[in-house]
């Protein structure tokens, strides 16, 4: 089985605990969520870019900008849970169909042959080429992975920043763990010098899901690690799924704090 279709899903809400209404914050004269949707639309490959939200306000704005919207429950606890709740509809859009057209064999085939690219709504400087690369990564391996995500080499000043998610990699590029702490810990060395002893990798907040894996999200057991770190991808790790990674240059700034919002505005003006 190979990936034959792809679709970008952008989960977004207004009730952000750390920075309320952040996706509507203006950056370079545009709301952040509009910048994200427009950057995703520049990627080659995906059949559509779909906003997934519980907000009627965001729904109205996205439609005015020309983007389709799928409404979700207010109770979704993460972006992945939000897009998983409409997985069938997302996959159907990738094929130009509706899910109610499918019989059971077609349903199974469509899910397994579709990549759903989850792009968080707080990445205003997302590079479209990264989205394109994520789709390509599914078919450039010996077997189609369950999940693909990009990583980047961290600069020393971000290694100990809890707002920057770190990724611990195996030799073959599999993600062993994700953390807000610096991993690995370098014993008997001052933390400021850890970068001199090993490479540290940051995680770009994007996930490429095989459709059947995404559709089964609500079947995954509760994850204590996810709750502790507040990192949704740990639910997959703890359940035994393999997350494949690939390196990208630089990083796409995720806006989670007021300081990062100001940084984004400065970048837009530069």
How does the language model describe each region?
Residues 8, 49-51, 116, 147-148, ...:
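Hydrophobic/aromatic residues located in beta-strands of well-ordered beta-sheets
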Residues 194-270:
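Conserved alpha/beta core of the MobA/IspD/sugar-nucleotide pyrophosphorylase nucleotidyltransferase superfamily
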Residues 126-220:
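Conserved core of the sugar-phosphate nucleotidyltransferase
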Residues 50, 56-136:
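Short phosphate-binding loop-to-helix
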Residues 46, 111-113, 142-145, 241:
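Short, high-confidence coil segments that cap the C-terminus of an alpha-helix
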Residues 17, 117, 124, 167, ...:
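Residues that recognize and position ribonucleotide moieties
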Residues 3-53:
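N-terminal glycine-rich phosphate-binding loop and ensuing alpha1 helix
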